[in-house]
Amino acid sequence: MWFIVFLLLWPQTPPELDFNAYRAHVEPLLLEKRPGHARCVVCHSTGTAFRLQPLPKGQAAYSEEASRKNFDMVKKFVRAGHPDESRLLLMPLAHEAGGTEFHPGGKHWETRDDPEWKTLADWVNGGR
């Protein structure tokens, strides 16, 4: 019995955030155009603490170098293994669903069941 209690109390190592999964699944969401909203990169490439690399004019995707810089920035707004404590997921989530009260870019997801929110949560939880 004591062994089970020990395991439950032992600190868990957070999952490692995977760059390739980020580039394949997360970064495209930052470039996605949503009805009634600007793409994340439009606002987050200037004037915010969450600063993404500007997308070069005429480009639809980032170079690997720019993606790595974005990955390093995004990691600052994520608590690996804890999507419910990660600002990347909470800022654009509706307040009624547990998101922050305000996000200047609007609320992109009404619930945690939104496929985009789930994609981000899966990545934060160590998914590939």
What residue spans do the PLM features occupy?
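Aromatic- and Gly/Pro-enriched helix-to-coil junctions and flexible linker segments
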Residues: 9-128
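Sec-dependent signal peptide recognition
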Residues: 1-7
